[in-house]
Amino acid sequence: MSVCLAITKGIAVSSIGLYSGLLASASLITSTTPLEVLTGSLTPTLTTLKNAATALGAFASTFFCVSFFGAPPSLRHPYLLYGMLVAPLSSFVLGCASNYQSRKYSKVSKESSLFPEDSKLAASELSDSIIDLGEDNHASENTPRDGKPAATTVSKPAEALHTGPPIHTKNLIAATAIAIVGFVQAVIGVYGEGQFI
């Protein structure tokens, strides 16, 4: 094996390792962080991760392609083709999921705009937010005649605090699994050629 081919394979395997690591980091961040934080303060960080992962995926695919087609026919191993397809396949999974979710969200937003009762309900909740904090009035309003405290309802903003994973997490985990499997098979393939011995 020529030195140039060994270098391109090393760069390809390293790039796909970094790519799968970035996808794993993004999966971990999105599965453990509340949705409001993801759409708010973490958006620039996730955008940077997405751009870096895209660049590394393209870089890895390019070097796997150069390694496969630049090698003599006896050294064209299938792991080079599989490594070349990892980034496009995981990007396809994420792209299809993103397209499906954006259509679903636009449909839900159109349906929710047809029902203005939610805005009236929110306005009535805001008008109830002014409370007289006098001692006698406050105690008599919260305690019914049977002596038990009145049940309190949770307002809409507190209900909106969503701590579960967003919908894209399953698709991101699938793309991460594809990248990790591609990285592992590439490392085994390079090791099988005797490059690490």
UniProtKB/Swiss-Prot annotation:
It is found in: Mitochondrion membrane. It comes from Saccharomyces cerevisiae (strain ATCC 204508 / S288c). Disulfide bonds: none annotated. Belongs to the ATG33 family. Residues 135-148 have a biased composition (Basic and acidic residues). The chain crosses the membrane at residues 10-30, 52-72, 78-98, 172-192. Residues 135-154 are annotated as: Disordered. It is a multi-pass membrane protein. The keyword Isomerase does not apply. GO terms for cellular component: mitochondrial membrane; mitochondrion. Keywords: Autophagy, Membrane, Mitochondrion, Phosphoprotein, Transmembrane, Transmembrane helix. GO terms for biological process: autophagy of mitochondrion; macroautophagy. The modification Phosphoserine is found at S127, S129. InterPro entries: ATG33. This is Autophagy-related protein 33. Involved in the selective degradation of mitochondria via autophagy during starvation and at post-log phase.
